[in-house]
Amino acid sequence: TFQTASYAELIDHPVETGIIEFLDFEAQGIPHRIALSGIYPDFDRTRFLADIQKICETELAMFPSPAPFTEYLFLLHLGDNLYGGLEHISSTALLADRHSLPSYDMGEADKAYTELLGLFSHEYFHAWNVKSIKPAVFAPYNLDQENYTEQLWAFEGITSYYDDLFLARSKTISPEAYLTLLAQSITRVQQTQGRLKQTLAQSSFSAWDKFYKQDENSPNAIVSYYQKGALAALCLDLIIREKSQGKYTLDSVMQQHYRDWCNTHQGIPEKHWQIRCQEITGLDLETFFQTALYSTEDLPLAECLQSVGVKLDFIPLPRQHGGAFASEPQSVAPANDLGARFKQSSDHAVLT
């Protein structure tokens, strides 16, 4: 017999039956379990557990105690051509391709495994950012109708910024691999003409009827609050670091938002995320927010990255290239598409 305190609590706990393999570990003393189901080959369970544990430890260390859960469950269903996830307060339901698990002879994480680690990182971060910190219109959720907010950039976009960043912070991927992921994100957004038609605030608000009802013209008409939201979060983080001379970061803002949630259990009203960010840091960020959220101007990526010694170049590359990190400039044949590539302006890159 299973019992919950409310209907809301019931639907926040996914259920799966079948043949399931359990892998257990602890992160900061909190029990975690990965439940694998579906069809998948043998894989390096030791490495997989160690990598997920490092990611969880790193995310837990960023936020003040207590964590929003006393135990955590990853439900991972594996098959062919699967990818996705849905967050819950103390668990997540994930779908992934069976070939994304690490093989015994894998050295540096390959593309498929990196994407899998990023999926774990993304949905785990949602325990703080969405399931705890959330828009006021989601507290509580109204399940009888759509809930509209301009703030999805702050909840999905910021989470998308941190998901890959935590792979670098936890050292499950190299700084160079992280910069390649970042270059690919920039390339995807720049190749979307919809960024010149729709603002981030509009993208967030119209998610119900545009982002989740896409057609063949969508790339020309809309921009992703996940992808562009992640780049806006990157710029915001770097601007805060530079303007405060390192006293504050986006981490500082997220930590205080979580404290606010723990103290009040109230959601964030529209536009108040930006107000609270400026209160926490003591910085005037209105010009940035106006540009990033309410205009279709391109984000100041090159200027922001230059502040931490990273140079952003746009060069002709085949579409399948997608963007990359380069320690030295490389000559490439002209192509019809622009791709983003990074090069270091010093002899090393350090991400913290």
Language-model features: locations:
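Non-catalytic architectural context of zinc metalloproteases
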Residues: 1-69, 82, 99, 103
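Zinc-dependent metallopeptidase catalytic helix centered on the HExxH motif
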Residues: 93-194
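Beta/coil-rich, acidic/histidine-enriched accessory regions frequently appended to metallopeptidases
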Residues: 263-352
